[in-house]
């Protein structure tokens, strides 16, 4: 969808550097390992396309994104364990250097979250950042073989999907 917006704005006569720095993206997270690199892949693809295809400046090449932990991964049975699932997804997002994060409440699988469950969801982020100290450290996963390999594999799969979409006329044509 991001490139669809880019093409639309360009067709209206705007220059890439006038709008691209203001774009931001929203991704859902999950528990599968591929979610550990979603931001890396998106940033790599975005930067390359903005630089090479659209001739955008450095600022336009910087992708900003928000992550929301996945409601799909929350279980209706034994909902008390959903905090663990959400914590793992939050760690993926933070290790992947997301710009902002929403952690789902453990009871969202069965109801509108209570005030107490929302407080617990917020506490997940606070504990990760303050007590674990991730906000003060560089990403320890950067350069790890599995992360680099996963990034390459996921990027390849995403680019193949982009090609399939383009063959069908882009996002709008595929709809």
Where are the language model's segments positioned?
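Charged/polar positions within long, soluble alpha-helices
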Residues: 7-11, 51, 93, 129, ...
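Active-site or pore-adjacent capping/gating segments
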Residues: 88, 99-175
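Metal- or metallocofactor-binding catalytic centers and their adjacent structured scaffolds
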Residues: 96
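Helix-rich catalytic cores of soluble enzyme domains
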Residues: 1-92, 105-122
């Amino acid at each position: 969808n991001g490139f669809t917006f880019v093409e639309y704005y360009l067709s209206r006569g705007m220059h890439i550097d006038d709008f691209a720095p203001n774009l931001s993206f929203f991704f859902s997270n999950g528990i599968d390992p591929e979610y550990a690199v979603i931001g890396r892949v998106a940033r790599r693809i975005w930067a390359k396309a903005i630089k090479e295809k659209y001739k955008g400046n450095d600022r336009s090449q910087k992708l900003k994104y928000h992550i929301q932990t996945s409601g799909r991964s929350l279980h209706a049975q034994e909902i008390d364990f959903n905090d663990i699932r959400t914590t793992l997804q939050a760690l993926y997002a933070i290790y992947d250097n997301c710009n902002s994060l929403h952690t789902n409440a453990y009871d969202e699988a069965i109801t509108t979250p209570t005030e107490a469950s929302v407080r617990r969801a917020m506490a997940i982020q606070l504990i990760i950042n303050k007590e674990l100290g991730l906000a003060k450290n560089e990403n320890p996963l950067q350069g790890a073989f599995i992360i680099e390999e996963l990034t390459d594999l996921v990027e390849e799969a995403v680019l193949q999907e982009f090609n399939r979409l383009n063959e069908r006329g882009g996002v709008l044509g595929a709809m």
